[in-house]
């Protein structure tokens, strides 16, 4: 019971201390190695521990004995304490989005002269887990500092690319339809191939018996589908030119909503303002110096003229 109360007291001290975290960025599926070195190298290390905010205990370690808590196992988090207990290292394997957060490592140290007094040292590490298709440099340039911001930035970029591709596909289909209506209609069956963006093709089949042309439905890609039907009538050569302008029915389920794109603006830092202030001050000093030189020469001439008059 006494040992349990001591552990609870130590945990409360660790969680109420103001953190000074070090940030580490990794990608989904990678392994992350977190390490801490203690400053007090003269005391005797009683125990080292690792926690994850807000209130999750990962492990407690005393020399080579390691005890895991809160469903953590050695398969997920491996522990190592090299350099004669001067450092504590954990490796989190196969990172997921749930592994992102603030980790705390703590050392519980006692003096060799006074074993009843226990000192502690703790260090904070922020682990950021980025999606596999977003690099750390892209995340920094976009202004994303947290896991949720990085995921939101990736989704906005994907939606913007999808909207651009959809618009280009619509333009290509419109041009193809106009070209079809202006072509000469043959009395025999024929098959025409039309190219659509991304190397996708569909066939147009003409049947003189039914007097109609049908354009097949494009294969579905993601959630965007395009269905186009063109109806025309084939007649004899006498009234061929009177039947060209037949109604064309085109149905499309292309979304027209354009997602907003967030643009990050550059903010001036304190060093920028100091540099601007220094340049302005230098310009003012040069102006004052030029004014003094001009004033000196002008006053010298006036004194010389007064001397000549006298």
Curated annotation (Swiss-Prot):
Intravirion compartment spans: 301-310
Stated name of the protein: Protein A56
Glycosylation, residue list: 39, 113, 133, 203
InterPro entries: Ig-like_dom, Ig-like_dom_sf, Ig-like_fold, Ig_sub, Ig_V-set
SMART domains cross-referenced by the UniProt entry: IG
Residue ranges that the UniProt entry lists as topological domain Virion surface: 17-275
Main location: virion
Source superkingdom: Viruses
Keywords annotated in UniProt: Disulfide bond, Glycoprotein, Hemagglutinin, Host membrane, Immunoglobulin domain, Late protein, Membrane, Signal, Transmembrane, Transmembrane helix, Viral envelope protein, Virion
Signal peptide limits: 1-16
Organism: Raccoon poxvirus
Ig-like V-type domain residues: 19-121
Presence of keyword Signal: yes
Disulfide bonds: 36-105
Subcellular location field: Virion membrane; Host membrane
């Amino acid at each position: 019971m006494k040992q349990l109360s001591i552990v609870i007291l130590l945990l409360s001290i660790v969680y109420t201390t103001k953190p000074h975290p070090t940030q580490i960025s990794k990608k989904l599926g990678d392994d992350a190695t977190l390490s801490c070195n203690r400053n007090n190298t003269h005391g005797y290390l009683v125990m080292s521990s690792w926690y994850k905010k807000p209130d999750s205990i990962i492990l407690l370690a005393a020399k080579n004995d390691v005890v895991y808590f809160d469903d953590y196992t050695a398969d997920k988090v491996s522990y190592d304490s090299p350099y004669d207990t001067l450092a504590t290292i954990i490796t989190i394997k196969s990172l997921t989005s749930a592994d992102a957060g603030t980790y705390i490592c703590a050392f519980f140290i006692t003096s060799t002269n006074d074993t009843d007094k226990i000192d502690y040292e703790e260090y904070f590490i922020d682990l950021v887990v980025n999606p596999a298709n977003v690099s750390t440099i892209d995340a920094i340039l976009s202004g994303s500092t947290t896991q949720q911001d990085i995921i939101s930035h990736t989704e906005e970029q994907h939606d913007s690319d999808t909207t651009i591709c959809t618009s280009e596909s619509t333009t290509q289909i419109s041009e193809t339809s106009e070209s079809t209506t202006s072509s000469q209609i043959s009395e025999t069956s024929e098959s025409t191939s039309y190219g659509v963006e991304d190397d996708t093709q569909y066939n147009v089949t003409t049947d003189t018996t039914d007097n109609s042309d049908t354009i097949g439905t494009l294969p579905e890609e993601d959630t965007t589908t395009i269905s186009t039907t063109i109806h025309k009538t084939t007649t004899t050569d006498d009234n061929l030119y009177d039947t060209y302008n037949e109604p064309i029915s085109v149905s499309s389920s292309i979304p027209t909503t354009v997602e907003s794109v967030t643009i990050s603006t550059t903010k001036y830092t304190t060093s920028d303002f100091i540099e601007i202030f220094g340049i302005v001050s230098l310009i003012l000093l040069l102006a004052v110096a030029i004014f003094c030189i001009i004033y000196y020469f002008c006053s010298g001439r006036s004194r010389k003229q007064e001397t000549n008059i006298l």
